[in-house]
């Protein structure tokens, strides 16, 4: 990692040593291990508003927000109250509950094209189930996905995935057989002409196109104007379904997610959506949903099987309902403004130190590519950055009490709890971090190593 000298964190270091003895790599999701930036991961013991506190008693301004879910900030009173009330009533029943009906109704109300929705436990389950449903509905097998887009760790979608696969520099992953990905076509993101060419050749075999509504697992790479609408058009022409992965963008970009800022305005809709993160309020909850005729193929109404013992868990549902109900227009305005503030502070500091970088955003999701490129529109562009400079920047900010994603290929997040005091702390820390990044010798571009949905 060049000139990076991670600071000491004795309690976290001891916890990490213990974890490595009993947990593969010492963590339960790869990007948390700090492999992309070096040093020892911080073991957090509490969160409050925009802050995290680690096992050594140090407090950090949190710009990860649990990889997106904590849009209200940590330990928001309404969420804590709802979860406490739910726990006191029992943790799981294995039956339908009133809360899951209310959460489904709220999702359907907020995202117009979603006529019916099924609750699950993770984004991976949601995308896996949506792909199975698309195949069952169309009677076709082929799926188109885009390099650098991450749709969970389901085998068929791990080909050229972003997030953790990118963070660790893995081309793919052992254990995923050729048979598992034989029906997956991976294309460059934002290249509509190539998608059209593949449809022209194989359109009658393609069940669905799955895409992140705005890519945020190779760093943040928004869709080029017309790209998502073009996918909709091609799917219509060839009888395929369009699946919008809004696990990261859903209910964070707006009340109706990325679709609310694009498709709703342009008058087009995906056939299926996947959701997660914000909709669970920090607890394990996700969903997939869409057109009623497509969802009608799902068991027990139809023949496409999907199930889950803990799906619709009452505690997760309570957290999700409380979070979504608290996400008012004022909350979204605050989050949007704070994202602009942080991006501006960091970009100014890097510019003043002559560090080549490219800020990139999709709504309130943002990241920085350490590159002199004028634009990054796909995975290849995201990979061609100087990630060692990010590592130096990361550790300087960490030492100053600012917690960033431990990978150059992950999105940054803010919450409605981030206030002027947090902006002042970030502004105070950024110049030294920019100097640390500038001190790293200009390397040859290195392959990306993104995280994975934390």
Swiss-Prot record:
Q: What is its main location?
A: cytoplasm
Needed co-factor(s):
pyridoxal 5'-phosphate
Q: Which GO terms describe its molecular function?
A: glutamate-1-semialdehyde 2,1-aminomutase activity; pyridoxal phosphate binding; transaminase activity
Q: Which SUPFAM superfamilies match?
A: PLP-dependent transferases
Q: Which GO terms describe its cellular component?
A: cytoplasm
Compartment(s) where it occurs, according to its Swiss-Prot or TrEMBL record: Cytoplasm
Q: Which UniProt keywords apply?
A: Cytoplasm, Isomerase, Porphyrin biosynthesis, Pyridoxal phosphate
User: What's the Enzyme Commission number for this chain?
Assistant: 5.4.3.8
N6-(pyridoxal phosphate)lysine modification sites are 277
Q: State the reactions this protein catalyses.
A: (S)-4-amino-5-oxopentanoate = 5-aminolevulinate
Q: Sorted alphabetically, which Gene3D superfamilies does this protein's record hold?
A: Aspartate Aminotransferase, domain 1, Type I PLP-dependent aspartate aminotransferase-like (Major domain)
Pathway membership of this protein?
Answer: Porphyrin-containing compound metabolism; protoporphyrin-IX biosynthesis; 5-aminolevulinate from L-glutamyl-tRNA(Glu): step 2/2
Q: Which family does it belong to?
A: Belongs to the class-III pyridoxal-phosphate-dependent aminotransferase family. HemL subfamily.
What protein does this entry describe? Answer: Glutamate-1-semialdehyde 2,1-aminomutase
Record the organism: Frankia alni (strain DSM 45986 / CECT 9034 / ACN14a)
């Amino acid at each position: 990692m060049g000139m990076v000298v991670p600071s000491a964190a004795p309690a976290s270091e001891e916890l990490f040593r213990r974890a490595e003895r009993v947990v593969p790599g010492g963590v339960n999701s790869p990007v948390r291990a700090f492999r992309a930036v070096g040093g020892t991961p911080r073991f957090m013991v509490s969160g409050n508003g925009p802050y995290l506190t680690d096992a050594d008693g140090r407090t950090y301004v949190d710009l990860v927000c649990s990889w997106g879910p904590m849009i209200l900030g940590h330990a928001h009173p309404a969420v804590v109250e709802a979860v406490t009330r739910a726990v006191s009533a029992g943790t799981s029943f294995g039956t339908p509950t009133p809360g899951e009906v209310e959460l489904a109704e709220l999702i359907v109300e907020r995202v117009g094209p979603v006529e019916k929705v099924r609750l699950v436990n993770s984004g991976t389950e949601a995308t896996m189930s949506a792909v199975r449903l698309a195949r069952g509905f169309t009677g076709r097998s082929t799926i188109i996905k885009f390099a650098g887009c991450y749709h969970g760790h389901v085998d068929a979608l791990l080909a050229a995935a972003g997030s953790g696969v990118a963070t660790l520099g893995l081309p793919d992953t052992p254990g995923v057989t050729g048979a598992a990905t034989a029906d997956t076509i991976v294309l460059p993101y934002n290249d509509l002409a190539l998608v059209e060419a593949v449809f022209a050749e194989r359109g009658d075999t393609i069940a669905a196109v799955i895409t992140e509504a705005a890519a945020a697992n190779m760093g943040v790479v928004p869709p080029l104007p017309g790209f998502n609408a073009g996918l909709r058009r091609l799917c219509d022409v060839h009888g395929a379904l369009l699946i919008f992965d809004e696990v990261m963008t859903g209910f964070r970009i707006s009340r109706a997610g990325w679709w609310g800022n694009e498709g709703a305005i342009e008058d087009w809709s995906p056939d299926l959506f996947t959701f997660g993160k914000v909709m669970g309020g920090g607890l394990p909850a996700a969903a997939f949903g869409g057109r009623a005729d497509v969802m009608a193929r799902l068991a027990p109404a139809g023949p496409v099987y999907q199930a889950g013992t803990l799906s619709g868990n009452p505690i997760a549902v309570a957290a999700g309902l409380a979070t979504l109900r608290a996400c008012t227009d004022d909350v979204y305005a605050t989050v949007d403004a704070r994202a602009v503030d942080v991006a501006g502070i960091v970009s100014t500091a890097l510019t003043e130190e002559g560090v080549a970088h490219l800020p990139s955003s999709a709504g309130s999701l943002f990241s920085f590519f350490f590159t002199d490129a004028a634009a990054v529109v796909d995975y290849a562009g995201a990979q061609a950055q100087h990630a060692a400079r990010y590592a130096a920047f990361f550790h300087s900010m960490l030492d100053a009490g600012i917690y960033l994603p431990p990978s150059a290929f992950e999105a940054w997040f803010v919450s409605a709890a981030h206030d002027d005091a947090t902006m002042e702390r970030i502004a105070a820390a950024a110049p030294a971090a920019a100097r640390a990044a500038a001190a790293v010798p200009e390397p040859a571009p290195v392959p990306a190593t993104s995280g994975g949905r934390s």
